A protein has these predicted regions:
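Non-catalytic peripheral regions of nucleotide-handling enzymes
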Residues: 1-82
Length: 82
């Protein structure tokens, strides 16, 4: 089952040397293993969207989607798969 977090939850992210996320802290904590990456850019209505999404496994057991929002310079967890 998928749980979409509304609003998305802000987290602190540690990146590796290649700029991939390797750990998060905040409402969700632990090491993460990135699985997939994609970018979304566009001008939705009156606010531009520039996001880098990652699908990752948190603590070896929880699949989640997180993204970096370049317009506010912040990471968020947006979706978890139970």
């Amino acid at each position: 089952m998928t749980r979409l977090l509304r609003p998305p939850t802000a987290v602190d992210v540690t990146l590796d040397h290649g700029r991939a996320p390797i750990a998060i802290a905040g409402a969700f904590n632990g090491s993460i293993e990135p699985i997939a990456r994609w970018k979304v850019e566009g001008s939705w209505w009156d606010r531009p969207v520039v996001r880098e999404y990652w699908k990752a496994v948190l603590n070896n057991n929880l699949l989640c989607e997180l993204y970096f929002d370049a317009t506010v310079n912040q990471w968020f967890v947006e979706r978890v798969y139970d």
